[in-house]
Amino acid sequence: MAELKLYPVGIQTFEEIITRNLLYVDKTEYVYRMTHSGGKHFFLSRPRRFGKSLLVSTFKSYFQGKKELFKGLAIEKLEKDWTEYPVLHFSMAGGKHMGKDQLERYLGNRLAEQEKVWGIKTPAVDANDRLISLIQTAYEKTGKQVVVLIDEYDAPLLDVVHEDAHLKDLRNVMRNFYSPLKDCEPMLRFVFLTGITKFSQMSIFSELNNITNISMDHEYAGICGITKEELETQMSADVDALAVKMNLTRAQTLDTLREFYDGYHFAAQSPDIFNPYSLLNAMAKSKLDYYWFTSGTPTYLIEMLKKFQVMPSDIGRCEADKSDFDAPTEMMVSIMPLLYQSGYITIKGYDPETELFTLDIPNKEIRVGLYRSLLPNYIGMTTPKGTTTIAKMSALIRRNDMDGALQMLQAFLATVPYCNQADSEGHYQQMMYVIFSILDNYVDVEVRTPSGRVDMVLRTATHLYLFELKLNKDAAAAMKQIDLKEYPKRFALSGLPIVKVGVNFDIATHNITDWKIEDYT
């Protein structure tokens, strides 16, 4: 077996990865393609921890003319002229959770770092004037056009996207900072911005009306992340090593990795793309886990779900027009663009006749991790007991012991605090939906039948469960409705034994009072 390189988990600097001989999945053909396309200003949107910062760092080393770092990579054979350019590299990643004054100081400090490099001792006052001065100085001192790289350009704004008043102040600060990039165009060789969202109305993109958004271009669909082909070729030995450690065949290992971390597509024509952060962590630790979610769940997403009153069962399969992806983030009427840009749903299909995209949750890691993060909205807290309860419920349901699973859920709900929204049947429906989704089973709500809608359908590997939920009634009433409406007939051809489940919740105790379970024959 080939000697394996160490994995650059959490390392986002291209030069360090190469000089330390860590694993690098070669993206330099994309670097060459973009820098020789004739354009100057480019923008790329990708989810967090998807390799954007490493890509920016790769551009930096390339434009600094560090040819020795690219030995053996695709660009070594493509690039004939390794010209060194002055590079201004800014990261906005540290500009989160700030007010207006603090953000202005943060930008000032980032500018001061560059001013020190270029010997500017008496900088201007305003951030935009200082950026202009930096570009002019670098251009005049070197006689070469300047490269500007801005990583996570939208980081200062994402946490306040749900706060209209606060967003306006911070947006004006950032707009002022970015505005020189258009006026300085003759002095610029290349401008590259990365982020999660496209703040169309932020005036960054109206000021930079010549910027090329490559986020959904099929030529760049695989520029970040790890494609299926890259996994099976550049990381082939790593897959074999993981298979040995997990006691699986190579094919089983690839299938398991695909189930957990694959499924992303960023264009109508896109290769299968794996989440790089989770994939590298899984390789490094020889264990599949929910690495992307444990690295942080953005609070802005949870707040936006609340703002738009999005139910957990609404997240998932949907259709969208191309224009929907460009909806201004701060003027959204739907949360779909933010869910897509943040990586919680992704492109799963495209119909060229209607020009409609089909989107859905990409993989098991996102599905389970997302619903885990939403669970506190329905049980009022995050608790280790909740995690262990759900794990035990999963084991019971796999054994077709729904009675035991509901007993466990009833006992758990008796220990959690009151939740303000727990006064409607819909609340309990969504709570059950979230819990069963965390168990990684197929679950759907309000499923149509010829005679009505089934509150919830749960499909496991061995059984199909039809749930009818009641509030302040009894389980017998729920079971009566299932029989009266003849819901099971709709699923007779499912190929699985059908189990009817009637559950009643009590608004006073916020818990299950009783349930009935019957096999359909």
Give, region by region, the residue ranges found by the protein language model.
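Metal-dependent nuclease catalytic cores in nucleic-acid-processing enzymes
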Residues: F177-C184, P337-I345, Y433-S437, Q481-V501
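Phosphate-binding site recognition
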Residues: M1-S424
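Structural motif
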Residues: V147, H463-Y465, V499
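Mg2+/Mn2+-dependent nuclease catalytic core
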Residues: L167-V173, L471-P488
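Active-site metal-binding core of divalent-cation-utilizing nuclease and nuclease-like domains
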Residues: T137-T142, Y433-A461
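Acidic-basic catalytic patches of nuclease active cores, encompassing PD-(D/E)XK
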Residues: A411-D444
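Conserved catalytic cores of phosphodiester-cleaving nucleases, focusing on short active-site segments
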Residues: M432, M456-L471, K485
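Domain-level recognition of nuclease-like catalytic cores that cleave nucleotide substrates
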Residues: R490, L496-T521
